[in-house]
Amino acid sequence: MHELSLCQSAVEIIQRQAEQHDVKRVTAVWLEIGALSCVEESAVRFSFEIVCHGTVAQGCDLHIVYKPAQAWCWDCSQVVEVHQHDAQCPLCHGERLRVDTGDSLIVKSIEVE
């Protein structure tokens, strides 16, 4: 379950930011998850709650935003959105795609008191 290690990394980032800005409590966190990141939302929510225990983010609201992946289509020379690894180009139905983004988990925003 790699969601646990991803959430641990996210909470470390949140903790560092909280320390740098003298924040006592984080009330909400927005995570951006790439469409090709292979993470389960329920596992992220479960893991996030566990790793937040005893931190400034304990009990905060978790908001998850999915970001479509972008790929370059070698057949029609266009940047397109894809939602799975073995996708076809939605414009020309070509299969020669170079996926450039979409496999990350990013702390997008933090709301504090």
Swiss-Prot record:
Keywords, ordered alphabetically: Metal-binding, Nickel, Zinc
Matching PROSITE patterns: HYPA
Domain of life, per lineage: Bacteria
Sections of the chain in a coiled coil: none
Binding residues for Zn(2+): C73, C76, C89, C92
GO molecular function, one term: nickel cation binding
Family: Belongs to the HypA/HybF family. HybF subfamily.
Matching PANTHER family: HYDROGENASE MATURATION FACTOR HYBF (PTHR34535:SF4), HYDROGENASE MATURATION FACTOR HYPA (PTHR34535)
Protein name: Hydrogenase maturation factor HybF
